[in-house]
């Protein structure tokens, strides 16, 4: 409330009366001046502020306030002087500088001070529009001299703000003032593409004036005719825009004048028409706009006039709209806007949309209205009446366009709704998503019977916005979706419609349209709605102004709660019901399953919000909020009588959602409980669909009866609907379909029931009519009722509507044509590749590699993107030159590229086995290639026994198709097995039907034989067959690319509870440089283990999720504040973030001090929790004696465990075991495991202490195996290695490769091949396991093997470097990444390529082949940079790049050049390169530990019995020899007696119970991994005896092993069985031998164990060792903590000592000072002499200095005596 002058005077008098001091009275003058300023007494305000300034002259606020008072009095000079003084006192007042500049420019522009202050303000406000206007004023006053500067100023401002209307108009005016009309026209032409300018009334007025002036000028006459036509085109477009804007903002008289001017422009352009050029097309379109605006002006005149004849005006307006609607759309493109859209096309859509809707609105409820209008006014009389109504001038009609136009050829053409919907989409683009336009369109559709296409409108505006969100409970702006915006538009249209109805009910003529034309109608939405819509558009299109983003987000966030009916939404229940009904109706009309699910799901959401409100309405009304987003209208309030009906609608919607989700039984139950025609209709649909599903196959009598029952129920429900409709006509309105559709469907059902009564359509004469049923699926009978897609909804993803079956034949035909084209292209590529040169890019010599069976075929389009899911997250993968498509396609073996059968339920786990086979063999999860013709194909001769099974299996939904004659997998021995004993995996599977192809070879090297056939067209056809799918009766559309199986994310935090989590910045103190270093930004968590109660602190970096803090919380830890900050805490802990325990000093910085204090409280609370838990921290174990014993015991058990594991895994022995004979699916054992060692690597090891039953048929490690064998032996090596897991439950039998890449490719040539699990790679990790190892606190998740494409390649060079790419556009080098650059050579085809990936992200930044024509060149100015040109595939596509790589050292750069040249040479010679990392040969240790060798030598010390001669070859082949380059280890032949003698091994076991020794194989009770324990048969063969006697000293050469392996492969089945039985005697012939103690040795422990017992012993020992290792680690961590504390104590002691020394020295100095003062002031004599020793001692004077000091003392004694004398 403003105070009056009298109030202020009374208050001032009272205050001054209480203030005796004059200075204090003056000090209150500022406050008094503000009070008088509020009372508008400016003179009194100046008086008091001046008194204040007299005592406080340096107060800038007072001077500014005085300047404001002078400015109000328009005393500019004094105001500027006060402001200037204020700025001098406080220079930070930027706005005051701008104020001074504006005042000076306003007062006198020529004043030199104005220029100074404008330049000063420009430095403070760069790019400000206000500064531009001031500069413009300064330059305007210079006249013609300043035009050039003004032009430069405007151009620079346009560059910054091209949408500024004032700047554009100013430029055009400058052109016009300087008579440069041509430049002005050119600028107008260019600026027409700017949407912001086209929507400005001032700009369009300027354009019209400029173009008219140009056309009338002499310059136009001198120019060519095309320029004149282009200017006329721009003029007509500008008139159309100006007319639209004038209709919306100006009065009727101005509209008439502008329309008349538009008329004259059209008339002048009419005479120059000819041809099909831009002017003709624009003229025709502008003619339509002219008549549309004429009709809108007529209705506007009726709105603003008095005593208006609405009938006459509406008839003339309808005539105008008819002419506008019948103007054809332009056929040529005029120009494109910013979005690349045709301008004329958008304007035509807008014209047709507005005209069409207005025609429907004017003719609504009036029969033959348009026909009467055409008959009455489509003539000269009507034309004259129209002219008189629009134009008030007395100009002759013949000279005007409207008076001379021919309007007599108008047809009575009413717009079609489908055409209008299409025009609306284009009109929305023209208006750029204006909420006013969208609301107007919604109001037009609100009166039409069809639903508006709001979804299509919004998709045009927001292309990338999701349709629905899964987070309806949140209000985050990021969660906004299309459905939210659709609901918002529905609400705006709904409330606008109700508001218009209320206004029109009082005074409304039948000829007056409910909603006026778009240009003349008032604002249809509220300001709140408009601001929210604009904020959403700004956020989605990311056009927010900096600094305004937070405000927009808050605005959007607030209204999302209302749109989703969350919390206190304040929505009227009637609006919620309207939303729910609209969404349910729209969803039911969609053909998309997901569209139905989203729409009906949102409808259910709103119904659930309405139901509680309906219960409240029964008791009382719902209060209306004060300022709602959507206004409440009492005319639509829900009455109590309507509540039951709405509740029924809600439950029907719930049931429909159940049906859509596939819960058919729940939906049927819900529908049956509701007695309504809508529920009857839905029940009829459900039962009819069930009957159709049964009809799809040949019917048995039971299925035929079931189908008849469903059809009977359908008929009954349809009859109920018809009966209810006849009795009550209002019921028919509730039906989602017309009543005629119900009757048509009833007739169809009745016809089907009659067919069943005649004997059934599918079962006649006791025979199945397969052909008829198939024909029925592809071509439905014309008499049968087929439900329209718009009349129904899908019930589940697996149940598509019947109309999709009509497309099967078309899709099949297209698939066949595509396959034929693919084959032709493959043959063409094959022929071209044969004739091409060796170095053709990129298909050179990259045929399919030899890969294991089971790969589903390869794509032969090299270089094309492959849309298959690999192991990585990327879906689209481009094939690089060194990647073969077979490897990429491997993980997507069960992807259906085109269509898949929805009935296929077969998985590898269902039948209990998963076996890798060739592409010709049987397949799992993929239907057999071919279409319906495949079903009628004649079965092959070899598969006669399986054909019937195939048909039955297909009917039951198992897509199992066993292979043809080329199948290479058989289970001959297993199928013939009759023994029920022995080792079995799992129980018998009742679903298992046996195996096919018995008697054939168990495993064969298919791809080894295919090496010479890789480029034949037949193989391409086989590969393509893998993608062919079989049409099923029930079609299911799946995505082309199937995502990989979801890998469960294991973080190590699963069993822990989050007690605290907060975002912080973590620092680590670096002791070397003595400073804090940032470690990461992320959430710091305190986790509590639910099992043992331990607490730990964990933090991961954002995005990369790298652990940057991970340590236990102990009671000894304490937080200390970081000096200089109240938001940071520091502490010390033994951290495991890098994997090893390391004492770290950490600090966490929080956003606010409150968060830091909260963290401290939580930390201390956690420490108090630890006091209640039994202490398990390491400091309890600090007992030197006990610790020493624990360490000793752990080391002993660790050593023994290693020796025992080494013997069991037996890396130097080959394993060959006989297949077990099992029953059912219990198949165990391995077939001929044959491995050919490479020249540089040892053979792989088979580890039998880990068993693996997994679903995967073949691991990706097959293609990445480090075993490099010959082409003939490579496939068996990779295929036939088995791993069996410990779990034997169920019948999930899996053949899986045990090979895994244990080291990087760069290390393969300097270490032996390590195969198996990570913890048991004995050969290469012996030294690593001897060292101490600290496990992290958080266990890592299981390793997910990643395929990089570099598995079958050796690394010949690898070093860190920085790579650059030359950008031709900007003409400079650009950095592409930093990482390891590698030169890789393929083992198979010897091709060499360069690969480089970025650090951390591993993104490819170089990937190309090395070709002979490539050469490295030094970059000018440096010798460490190499430059070359190559066709690179780093971005997935072939692209010629200029690359440069820079190394840190010159030696590395030279080495890269050397290896590069060697690679080209080796590639030409087809030879392998010696890798750079293995040039220096390093001595290799024995792959077996010394203790393990001692154990074996001790075991084999006694001479064994003689081995039978027939077994020599097998015994030799069982010995695995490591083909290292240095020395080969001793080959040991197993003795029949097995004695544990080594003390290290003996300590492992504690039980001396003797049991038979067997390892899992029923026939190998007397054998262990190839070592025979059975009684050997006597033989006189001396040769074999010598071999056996040599024992461990005998050596077997690798070539002999290879020969024996190959001979094993080539043997027949009979010989194979003989050999296996020879080396592994059967159970009947085996004799159990005990392990006897040697006579010469002291009595030792005898061991006879089974394999299970040994495995159990090994497990318990491993657990014990792990426990002891854990204790060791705790001791080590405690010791580290104690050592750190000792260091801290020592440093503290040293600090104290230094302080003591300083204090002592300070005391000594003080004492010396006192002594010297006494010496100086004492009188000469004996007292002074007594101080001399003290001074000499403290100052450590030399003898000479002592003498001088004594002489000084003596002189001082003699001087007084001399003076007295």
UniProtKB/Swiss-Prot annotation:
Annotated ranges, domain GRIP: 1702-1752
Keyword set, alphabetical order: Phosphoprotein, Repeat, TPR repeat
Superkingdom of the organism of origin: Eukaryota
GO biological process, one term: NLS-bearing protein import into nucleus
Residues that span the membrane, as ranges: none
Listed Acidic residues bias regions: 1317-1329
UniProt feature, compositional bias: Basic and acidic residues: 1594-1617
Entries under SMART domains matching the protein: Grip, RanBD, TPR
Pfam families per the UniProt record, alphabetical: GRIP, Rab_bind, Ran_BP1
Residues annotated as signal peptide: none
GO molecular function, one term: small GTPase binding
Compositional bias of kind Low complexity: 778-797
Residue positions where Phosphothreonine is found in the record: 19
Record-annotated RanBD1 domain positions: 1036-1172, 1333-1469
Keyword S-adenosyl-L-methionine: no
One Gene Ontology cellular component: cytoplasm
PROSITE patterns given in the database record: GRIP (PS50913), RANBD1 (PS50196), TPR (PS50005), TPR_REGION (PS50293)
Additional free-text comment from the UniProt record: One of the 8 copies of RANBP2 clustered close to the chromosome 2 centromere.
Quaternary data: Interacts with GTP-bound ARL1.
UniProt-recorded name of the protein: RANBP2-like and GRIP domain-containing protein 8
Source organism of this protein record: Homo sapiens (Human)
